[in-house]
Amino acid sequence: MDNTTRETIQAFLAQYETLAIATENKGRPYVTRVFFVEGPVTESSLKLYGTFITSSRKLANLRENPRVGLFIGPSTPSIWLEATAEASILTDESAIADVREKLGEKSPTAAGFIAQVPTAAVELQVNWLRITNLSGGPVQTEVSFGTEFPGGE
């Protein structure tokens, strides 16, 4: 991955506080939004982190099937990111505290949400992503992180 691609991904992710996550349970899809914070984009990895209400359907679905689809972008898409990822529920208390702190720094709304409800911290290891840009610049930026879950249509 070249520096331009890395910078494109980082700049895109920094603009948004929430993502849409698609989970599945027994063949039934479920899509909802969650607050997220991004880790660094490296040659081999991109991790996103979020908190999920402990009694939520999406968290229960992740326990059964950690493979997810992601969408980040505006309501009227002119530029958007779609991705596949593998979710894991964090158990290390310092890692959980770090996710909550970083979410609060990125989004005051997320901080208020986290303070009001019991949450679990989740790591999303991105396998594949594509940014589509209809407003100028490269139309598509696509990256695979060397995994078995290629994206695309």
For every predicted segment, state its role.
Residues 1-19, 145-153:
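Extreme N-terminal tail/first-helix region
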Residues 16-54, 60-62, 68-72, 80-84:
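Short beta-strand segments
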Residues 17-18, 67, 108, 129:
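Generic structural signal for secondary-structure transition and capping sites
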Residues 52-56, 65-69, 99-111:
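Short acidic (Asp/Glu) patches
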Residues 56-58, 77, 137-139:
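Short, surface-exposed beta-strand-loop junctions and turns on beta-sheet-rich folds
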Residues 82-153:
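Charged, gly/pro-rich active-site loop segments
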